[in-house]
Amino acid sequence: MAPRVTPLLAFSLLVLWTFPAPTLGGANDAEDCCLSVTQRPIPGNIVKAFRYLLNEDGCRVPAVVFTTLRGYQLCAPPDQPWVDRIIRRLKKSSAKNKGNSTRRSPVS
């Protein structure tokens, strides 16, 4: 019986070693996920960009990530009114900049 067990054990170990174990459910699958969000409002005038990191993206904590003028990334809760105000301001500013960049100055 021992001669049959050894090859089976070796094969089982080889299979386990070759194929990675599946990740546990509920883990942060994405590398960029926020571990927590700040409830304290962030001044809108220091924010230059934003992006969403939601549960659908593999993140356990849904968040809006604001990038500041100095390059810091701050995680905020997407359901807060102050977060919506900053996002609206950034979208409005972005729309203005796109409108200005498409206009051509007259050639004199």
Curated annotation (Swiss-Prot):
Cysteines paired by S-S bonds? 33-59, 34-75
Which PROSITE patterns does the UniProt record give?
A: SMALL_CYTOKINES_CC
State the name under which the record lists this protein: C-C motif chemokine 19
The entry describes its oligomerization and partners as: Interacts with TNFAIP6 (via Link domain).
Q: Keywords in alphabetical order, please.
A: Chemotaxis, Cytokine, Disulfide bond, Glycoprotein, Inflammatory response, Secreted, Signal
Tissue distribution? Highly expressed by dendritic cells in mesenteric and peripheral lymph nodes. Significant expression in spleen (T cell zone or periarteriolar lymphatic sheath) and Peyer patches. Low expression in thymus.
Molecular function per GO: CCR7 chemokine receptor binding; chemokine activity; chemokine receptor binding
Gene for this chain: Ccl19
Compartment(s):
Secreted
Highest rank taxon of the organism: Eukaryota
Function field: Strongly chemotactic for naive (L-selectinhi) CD4 T-cells and for CD8 T-cells and weakly attractive for resting B-cells and memory (L-selectinlo) CD4 T-cells. May play a role in promoting encounters between recirculating T-cells and dendritic cells and in the migration of activated B-cells into the T-zone of secondary lymphoid tissues. Binds to chemokine receptor CCR7. Binds to atypical chemokine receptor ACKR4 and mediates the recruitment of beta-arrestin (ARRB1/2) to ACKR4.
Family, per the entry?
A: Belongs to the intercrine beta (chemokine CC) family.
Query: What biological process terms from GO does the record include?
Result: CCL19-activated CCR7 signaling pathway; cell maturation; cellular response to prostaglandin E stimulus; dendritic cell chemotaxis; establishment of T cell polarity; immune response; immunological synapse formation; inflammatory response
- What species does this protein belong to? Mus musculus (Mouse)
GO CC entries: external side of plasma membrane; extracellular space
Stretches that traverse the bilayer: none
**Which sites carry carbohydrate?**
100
Signal peptide stretch: 1-25
